[in-house]
Amino acid sequence: MTSPDFSNIKHDMETVDFEQFRQIINVANQSLPDCIHEFFDVPGKQHYRLLAYLSTLYNNTTIIDIGSHRGNSATALSYNTTNTVHSFDIEDKVLNPAIRILPNVQFHLDNLFDLLVADKWKDTILQSPFIFLDVNGSMEIDFYNYLKSIGYAGFVICDDIWYFKEMRDNFWYKIPDEYRYDVTELGHWSGTGIFTLNPDIRFPKRDNSAWTLVTAYFNLTKCPDASEEIIKRDATYYFSHSLSTLALPYNLVIYCDNESYPEILSRRPEYLSSRTQYIIREFDEFHFKKDGVLLDDNFAKYRDQINKNRRNKPYHFDNRNTASYYLFCMSRYAMLKETIELNPFKSSHFCWINFCIERMGYQNLIRLDEALSIKRNKFSTCYIDYVPEPLVQNTEEYYRFGRCGMCSGFFTGNAHYMYKVCDLIENKFLEYVQQGYGHADEQLYSPVYFQNSQLFEHYYGDYLQMITNYTYIYDSPEPPIYNFITRSFDNANYVKCVEACEFVLKSYFLKKCNMSDEYLNELYHYYMEAKKHLHTP
């Protein structure tokens, strides 16, 4: 089976004339207008144009569609009328008579996940250059193994690889990275992936080999200051949300305690062993480093000091933010500095990613690969809430509440900028502890930034968009407007206000996000007024 050239697939998809389906879909769904819009929606929102395009790459052959549902995928696959589409489902849900009578589509009530049934269709499967798979995440891996066992030489398009945790954990992450491709930007908003066991079939894939990502898990429920909130989020909780980080197909350094290591080792896919470095250390054994020298006090000593500071200078904070939790957050910077020094994968760029990043939503998982491909050099993090510089300089007032302006769950930079900013954050921590304060690592970002703004490159969003909005505002453009743009304007930081406005506007004009007229007008207002203050056209 000769493989087509997929290198320009995004451009080539534009040649598909989808209007030929207009009458078929309209006739079918007069009472369901959303179904009409769904079918004709653009790549990245719906996958039907991708399926139609792929059908044009092969002639006079058989295409398999597993999961007929309403018949829309079979309809798209029927675009090239020289091919025959065999569409399978265990229930008949094709209500559209125009779809049912398509001359090159045959619908079957058969379960191809039953291996006895699959064997009945084995010859047809082997003849099919590609298969479309749209089911539920519980049986796909068995079908993958079946295709592997019979020597299937085509490729399989899979729907919903990101949205459903079952699809991610039980299927997508179990396929070695060398065999799979994420084509969500060409397919469905919920995640579209392609896998193939044929080394001659290759789809475009970003090269993110220059990165080392760092993550960590320590069981803070064992710490002497574990609060009820900490205990509720025990090891079971974090491990249940860990696979999206542990299955990342990048160079990954994992810090953990001895107790957690076996469980983490079992969850990191074996095919990624060559891209994995484990550093095992008990939590209280961490030390900060100042001017290149490890300080004498370990985390146990700092925990006592932070608790003393909080008694002497009480403030309002979340009970989950114990002194040990604060120190865990601070360990990020010590771990990144150490990783940069060791540099086991000879990387140029480094990234912190939370162990349980999937809790922030599937869209962050979708956008991670694109975010890394940008290869920003400066320290880059999500600016969430503008805290004015005069308030930051008033340390006593600043520390009355947990005022956190930037996100520490995901941040990036090259070796130079990452090490420099991590070092500055550590130094600022030590400075505030000595002054009798201590809240959270994110509260250290603003004072470091205002003193070293040249080291930072921001993007904008809220916690749930800490990766999603790295390149563009893909989700929720409103929080940057009311949390950052309005507040930076009100506090006369017109440079950052304009920067944030342009970041949101660019995303909107490139159709990366939607925005109501109300918010768009508000955005324009602040943008134009801020530019007036800067005397820029």
Predicted regions mapped to residue ranges:
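Short, aromatic/basic amphipathic alpha-helical patches
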Residues: 96-103, 167-177, 261-275, 292-297
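Catalytic core and acceptor-binding pocket of nucleotide-sugar-dependent glycosyltransferases
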Residues: 164, 359-363, 381, 387, ...
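Well-ordered, non-membrane alpha-helical segments in soluble/globular domains
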Residues: 170-171, 228-243, 364-369, 443
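Active-site-proximal specificity loops/subdomain of glycosyltransferases
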Residues: 271-344
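GT-A fold catalytic core of metal-dependent nucleotide-sugar glycosyltransferases
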Residues: 324-383
